[in-house]
């Protein structure tokens, strides 16, 4: 592990995680990722709770650690439940690019894949994963790497998930090509992106921010998204579902700092962002090579 990527506070949190006791606990899945502890005294429960608080903000989830409910900003099971009917992961090598704290990877464990590897350069979300996996004890491999590292990464994958990443990239076609290099022959990519619900082969390129987010480069129409995928030499573009992002799926909770969706929309017209652009809608697609 390259500790040069960690600041001093993050090193301290990592040390606290690694020094946690090896608890007797059971892992289960529902809409939340659940850990049930056996014989957990109040002092240990307080230690777990305080460590979870130190790892705010929690964007993906939720997680239930005994009776500690980490109510994340995103109700991530909504997205996972959209993808679930289309998943066939048994015996496959799976990657989640932009894996955040591992919520989706933990959910994938029930599909009996051969392996799961997560890629995300965020030390913060890596620490959240390390904290959770201290109790879950999965064999998930978390790499502090971004999508640009995939062409040189040693392993290849049968299925790759890349959810909520492409609009953060200044060259989306290059990103798709990088994802393609990491797939085995016959592999598939599940992609989720914000999109513009209009006809035409174009993408919105926000002047400064979109929904108060500074690093949004291109929000495509569905037709433009398909064109990107085909230019990257993917085939069998399949639109699985579209969905408007609403206040049930993304909202402020005590487990995040700052604002959430209600602050990002025009208070007089929730079909628009605060900047006047169309409000976020998401498209879920699958492509193959």
Swiss-Prot record:
Its EC number is 2.5.1.-. CDD domains: AdoMet_MTases. It comes from the Bacteria. Transmembrane segments: none annotated. Keywords: Transferase, tRNA processing. Carboxy-S-adenosyl-L-methionine binds at residues 60, 74, 79, 98, 120-122, 147-148, 167, 282. One of its GO terms (molecular function) is transferase activity, transferring alkyl or aryl (other than methyl) groups. Catalyzes carboxymethyl transfer from carboxy-S-adenosyl-L-methionine (Cx-SAM) to 5-hydroxyuridine (ho5U) to form 5-carboxymethoxyuridine (cmo5U) at position 34 in tRNAs. This is tRNA U34 carboxymethyltransferase. It comes from Campylobacter concisus (strain 13826). The lineage of its organism: Bacteria, Pseudomonadati, Campylobacterota, Epsilonproteobacteria, Campylobacterales. The gene is cmoB.
